[in-house]
Swiss-Prot record:
One of its GO terms (cellular component) is plasma membrane. It comes from Saccharophagus degradans (strain 2-40 / ATCC 43961 / DSM 17024). This is Undecaprenyl-diphosphatase. It catalyses: di-trans,octa-cis-undecaprenyl diphosphate + H2O = di-trans,octa-cis-undecaprenyl phosphate + phosphate + H(+). It is a multi-pass membrane protein. GO terms for biological process: cell wall organization; peptidoglycan biosynthetic process; regulation of cell shape; response to antibiotic. Belongs to the UppP family.
Amino acid sequence: MDILHAVFLALIQGITEFLPISSSAHLILPKELFGWEDQGLAFDVAVHVGTLSAVILYFRKDIVNLIAGWFGSITGKQSENGSLAWCIIVATVPAGLFGLLLGNFIEEHLRSVSVIATTTVVFGLLLWFADAKHSETKQLAQMTLFIALVIGLAQALAMIPGTSRSGITITAALLLGFGRSDAARFSFLLSIPIITLSGGYMGLKLLEESNVNWQEIGVGVLVSAISAYICIHYFLSFINKIGMLPFVIYRLLLGAGLFALVWFA
């Protein structure tokens, strides 16, 4: 993989990781349209490190408060940050278990273009329904362990390619009564442990490889981190004004394009 390919793929990962449009749907397109080779495990780890760095940097103050609140809750001092930290932990469990139990099956059987096209469209329509019907009756401070578990179960569905982790968690939060901004904020905070687990798992597998292109890795980390940070900032700035409809329309067009690849291949 040359540097131009690395920049392009890292840019795709950085932008699509946090927008509700599915990163896997976009990463499969260069392979199908241009015949590009698979980016490889090392590059996957690199872009995970990049996107993780971006979300940690953006929410650094929140993370410090969440950690302090969590430690405080252990010593018996209750706080909103402590409760939210426990909610994030609980919401992470379903996806972790789902990945351990079904990760290999999904990799072997559900990474086809037809599956990604279907999930891109179906979950895009579900996002539209949730956004149209959301009532904004809850704030993030009202998050409970049960609600977090439901959102976590939704996040587990994102193991299926094309679903979009941010898309399905925002959808679930909207359906449960949260506003767009709070739904997106919780989704992004929830991404931190799940990206850490996923990147850590791939990192362990990477130890078995001997041929690693460090230039590609550097490009992957840097480009994905910068693009992801910018994406998070503008998404949170404009989501209450523009809503989810632009992303729904985009998903429908993308799904149609993927179906066209299947039908005319």
